A protein has these predicted regions:
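Extended acidic low-complexity intrinsically disordered regions
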Residues: 1-28, 267-268, 272-273, 279-280, ...
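Compact mixed alphabeta submodule
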Residues: 129-263
């Protein structure tokens, strides 16, 4: 059989239609991983572990909260997805949020779930031990957390009165000189989904730097400014997200839905019934309440570091 016939026998257009992009176009790196973010490597069984330390950034921020679009739609056995941070985080319009709002207002709550946004939490971490990728050790990354993981941190930082009465003490998660490391553990659950339920705070307080000056230098030079994630230019533009909306909804070749043709309007507050859609307090000033820990020496160390970041 001539070679050219073999090539013609493969339908490149069908492949493009199936995945929603031209797999051989230069822009295929649009799905490349953001190397600033740490990803815990898992084995074939879904297990993975690393030892990390949370750090403040050079502007003293500990954690920022962001909305994320995570939409997957299947049509005629073809699956397409979008996984992007939403500009609704900072009050800018987002076509996915608008579509969710329209469907919700029409009473189509199940369909609206396809366009709902999740809440994610971002922090700086330093990798202390990474058995699967030892080359990561000593490096600082951004780490994206779920609400469940963030709650685990909050409970460690600020235990309830009941827990305190039972002997539990606040942990110094963001203190690099006299604080607690965090054991990040991934496992595959009974539902076949990866979870981080086994992750835990290390009880022993340790220092990951020799001096305050060393800590300040590393934080200033190598952490990522969390405030930069909240700048408009850090998000895809409305037009770019509209193109993503049309692609994921298989609407590229048809008239765009009304939701993306309307004049851009402020995002409408979400109904109470869907907590993940509820607007949050502006995240620019979000910091972990480290100072609530009672140990004076630990607080003194952290205060010295934060003063050095001014």
């Amino acid at each position: 059989m001539p070679v050219e016939n073999s090539v013609d026998a493969f339908n490149f257009n069908a492949l493009k239609d199936a995945v929603g992009i031209d797999p051989f176009a230069k822009q295929t790196n649009k799905y490349a991983r953001d190397e600033r973010f740490y990803v815990l490597q898992k084995d074939k069984n879904g297990n993975g572990a690393a030892l990390i330390r949370f750090l403040p950034d050079s502007e003293k921020r500990m954690i920022v909260q962001m909305y994320k679009i995570n939409t997957t739609i299947t049509k005629n056995d073809k699956k397409r997805f979008v996984n992007e941070f939403s500009p609704a985080t900072i009050g800018l319009p987002c076509p996915f949020q608008e579509k969710w709002q329209d469907l919700w207002n029409e009473g189509k709550k199940d369909e609206a779930k396809n366009f709902s946004r999740s809440i994610r939490y971002i922090a700086n971490i330093k990798i202390l031990k990474d058995p699967a990728n030892p080359e990561n050790e000593g490096k600082i990354f951004l780490y994206e957390m779920s609400g469940a993981m963030n709650s685990k941190l909050e409970k460690a930082l600020n235990p309830s009165e009941t827990d305190v009465s039972l002997g539990k003490t606040p942990k110094q998660l963001f203190n690099p000189l006299k604080g607690n490391s965090f054991r990040l553990v991934a496992q595959r659950g009974s539902n076949n989904q990866i979870n981080y339920d086994a992750s835990e705070v290390v009880a022993e307080e340790t220092s990951i730097y020799q001096t305050v000056e060393e800590a300040i230098k590393d934080i200033k030079e190598n952490t990522y400014k969390l405030g930069d994630l909240l700048k408009p230019e850090s998000f895809k533009s409305y037009d770019e997200l509209k193109k993503e909306f049309l692609r994921v909804t298989f609407a590229e070749q048809t008239a765009a839905p009304t939701v993306v043709q309307e004049t851009v309007a402020p995002v409408t507050p979400a109904p109470v019934e869907t907590p993940v859609q509820t607007p949050v307090t502006p995240v620019q000033e979000t910091v972990a309440p480290v100072a609530s820990a009672p140990a004076p020496s630990a607080n003194d160390d952290l205060d010295a570091i934060l003063q050095g970041l001014v």
